[in-house]
């Protein structure tokens, strides 16, 4: 990734992330990790080799540790609608 001096506008940071692995937080307790192939000004984007992580809260479960469940799905290529995007960042460890 290039230096922070190349970032003059918010979408410049996204541009610098092209062909890099990114973390995308979505509405509805969804998260994505994948390679950013394309995006537009609405933050519609195409991710390759993407993993979706969905967090579900089971309110009928009495044990709070077991109430939170995650479901993971893998996609070779995925289109993400921009109005569902909350944030884009480098991948979390």
Swiss-Prot record:
Q: Where in the cell is it found?
A: Nucleus; Cytoplasm
Residues that the record marks as modified (Phosphoserine) are: 84
How is this protein organized at the quaternary level?
A: Component of the heptameric LSM1-LSM7 complex that forms a seven-membered ring structure with a donut shape. The LSm subunits are arranged in the order lsm1, lsm2, lsm3, lsm6, lsm5, lsm7 and lsm4. Component of the heptameric LSM2-LSM8 complex that forms a seven-membered ring structure with a donut shape. The LSm subunits are arranged in the order lsm8, lsm2, lsm3, lsm6, lsm5, lsm7 and lsm4.
Describe the function of this protein. Answer: Component of LSm protein complexes, which are involved in RNA processing and may function in a chaperone-like manner. Component of the cytoplasmic LSM1-LSM7 complex which is involved in mRNA degradation by activating the decapping step. The LSM1-LSM7 complex loads onto the 3'-end of single stranded RNA. Component of the nuclear LSM2-LSM8 complex, which is involved in spliceosome assembly. The LSM2-LSM8 complex plays a role in the biogenesis of the spliceosomal U4/U6-U5 tri-snRNP complex by accelerating prp24-mediated annealing of U4/U6 di-snRNA.
Question: What is the recorded name of this protein?
Answer: LSM complex subunit lsm3
Keyword Signal attached:
no
Show where the Sm domain sits: 9-93
The stretch of residues making up the signal peptide is none
Q: Name one GO molecular function term.
A: RNA binding
Q: What is its main location?
A: nucleus
Give the InterPro entries listed for this entry: Lsm3, LSM_dom_sf, Sm, Sm-like_LSM3, Sm_dom_euk/arc
Q: Which organism is it from?
A: Schizosaccharomyces pombe (strain 972 / ATCC 24843) (Fission yeast)
Q: Which SUPFAM superfamilies match?
A: Sm-like ribonucleoproteins
Q: Which GO terms describe its cellular component?
A: catalytic step 2 spliceosome; chromosome, telomeric repeat region; Lsm1-7-Pat1 complex; Lsm2-8 complex; nucleolus; nucleus; P-body; precatalytic spliceosome
Q: In its UniProt record, which GO terms are filed under biological process?
A: mRNA splicing, via spliceosome; P-body assembly; RNA folding
- Keywords, ordered alphabetically: Cytoplasm, mRNA processing, mRNA splicing, Nucleus, Phosphoprotein, Ribonucleoprotein, RNA-binding, Spliceosome
Nucleus: present as a keyword of the record? yes
What family does the entry list? Belongs to the snRNP Sm proteins family.
């Amino acid at each position: 990734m290039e230096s922070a001096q190349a970032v003059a506008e918010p979408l410049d940071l996204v541009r610098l992330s092209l062909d890099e692995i990114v973390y995308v937080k979505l509405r509805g307790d969804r998260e994505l990790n994948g390679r950013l192939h394309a995006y537009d000004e609405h933050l519609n984007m195409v991710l390759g080799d993407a993993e979706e992580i969905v967090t579900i809260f089971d309110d009928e479960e009495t044990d709070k540790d077991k109430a939170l469940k995650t479901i993971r799905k893998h996609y070779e290529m995925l289109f993400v609608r921009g109005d569902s995007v909350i944030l884009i960042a480098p991948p979390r460890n």
